[in-house]
UniProtKB/Swiss-Prot annotation:
Keywords: Cytoplasm, NAD, Oxidoreductase
Lineage of origin: Eukaryota, Fungi, Dikarya, Ascomycota, Pezizomycotina
Thermal dependence of catalysis: Thermostable up to 55 degrees Celsius.
Gene responsible for this protein: FDH
Keyword Lipoprotein attached: no
Subunit structure and binding partners: Homodimer.
Membrane spanning residue stretches: none
The protein's name in its UniProt record: Formate dehydrogenase
Any single biological process term in GO: formate catabolic process
GO CC, alphabetical: cytosol
EC number(s) from the headed UniProt entry: 1.17.1.9
PANTHER family xrefs: FORMATE DEHYDROGENASE 1
Enzyme class: oxidoreductase
Length: 370
């Protein structure tokens, strides 16, 4: 019998109304009956942050843990050291930066860390394009004006622009970044740029109509819109700080659906306040859930707009939840059956080694100036 611990977010009445909210503590990724029919135990909780949390208590004798980027149970080196039986850590979604991967490689002979690669890349890419449009078209202040019973076209049109003719750049052109560029192609942007250590093929660049810029600061200086689509690792943590933001065009927009810790939140808020950034939007925060006084909840530009922040939802649409729930079950089945036939693309660390280059495990994956 195997004990499985799942750290998920609470759905409350919403999970009852919509059973498709699979990523909640109530609906448990649809796993309970399947696991219990095999004689295994499933413990589900959202309690993860306080001292002596259910997460901490139940982790000590769990063999498998399931976490999610949308309500991350941070698997620190200290927590892993107490998890004497842990063999498999599964991310329900994509992005395993909430796990100390170096420590996972050294714990219990090497804990396998896996995620459901590709499960929500379309979902996030769509959210990026939506956020770009929401910011550029100044949608949020306009909608708030209508809700307040007011009507002042000039007030909102003074900070509204077209996406056509703008230069858009992505930091990272992996599965999400590439899909963002493809979706932007139809907006007749002046130019689509990308910064990544790994270039796209010439054929893809021609098909999408994009161009690689090898220096990050050089790309930022050209862009009206910048979207962050790279993983969080030590070279990208705090990357968008006061210094790097100062290299961006004054009045540009920044979108972040990657990870909250890639930006320095106070520096983003100050750039908004001064108008150096016209807008900032996305759905990722650090920590998560975001505290009520998190500066990016209320940061605004000089016109009182420019904020398109939402809870961490871009990758957890109902369609995405179905895909990553199925993926988690597939990974669990590979382990519980003893086949260990994981999809190679799902593996982050395995058998004490890194199985991917996505988390900065290369000498050439270094951000200039870092």
């Amino acid at each position: 019998m195997v004990k499985v611990l799942a750290v998920l977010y609470d759905g409350g009445e919403h999970a009852k109304q919509v059973p498709g909210l699979l990523g909640t503590t109530e609906n448990e990724l649809g796993l309970r009956k399947w696991l219990e029919d095999q004689g295994h135990t499933l413990v589900t909780t959202s309690d993860k942050d306080r001292e002596g949390s259910t997460f901490d208590r139940e982790l000590e004798d769990a063999e498998i843990i399931i976490t999610t980027p949308f309500h991350p149970g941070y698997l620190t080196a200290e927590r892993l050291a107490r998890a004497k039986k842990l063999k498999l850590a599964v991310t329900a979604g994509i992005g395993s930066d909430h796990v100390d991967l170096d420590a996972a490689n050294k714990t219990n002979g090497g804990i396998t860390v896996a995620e459901v690669t590709g499960s929500n890349v379309v979902s996030v890419a769509e959210h990026v394009v939506m956020t770009i449009l929401v910011l550029v078209r100044n949608f949020v202040p306009a909608h708030e004006q209508i809700e307040a019973g007011r009507w002042d076209v000039a007030e909102v049109a003074k900070d509204e622009y077209d996406l056509e003719g703008k230069v858009v750049g992505t930091v990272g052109v992996g599965r999400i970044g590439e899909r963002v560029l493809r979706r932007l192609k139809g907006f007749d942007c002046k130019e689509l740029l990308y910064y990544d250590y790994q270039p796209l093929s010439p054929e893809k660049e021609k098909e999408i109509g994009c161009r690689r810029v090898e220096n990050l600061e050089e790309m930022l200086a050209q862009c009206d819109v910048v979207t962050i689509n790279c993983p969080l690792h030590e070279s990208t943590r705090g990357l968008f700080n006061k210094d790097l933001i100062s290299k961006m065009k004054r009045g540009s927009w920044l979108v972040n659906t990657a990870r909250g810790a890639i930006v320095v939140k106070e520096d983003v808020a100050e750039a908004l306040r001064t108008g150096h950034l016209r807008g900032y939007g996305g759905d990722v925060w650090f920590p998560q859930p975001a505290p009520a006084d998190h500066v990016l909840r209320t940061a605004k530009n000089p016109f009182g707009g420019g904020n398109a922040m939402v809870p961490h939802m871009s990758g957890t649409s109902l369609d995405a939840q179905k895909r990553y729930a199925e993926g988690v079950k597939r990974i669990l089945d590979s382990y519980l059956s003893g086949r260990f036939d994981y999809r190679p693309e799902d593996l982050i660390v395995h058998q004490g080694k890194y199985a991917t280059r996505a988390y900065g495990q290369r000498e050439d994956v270094k951000i200039p100036g870092q």
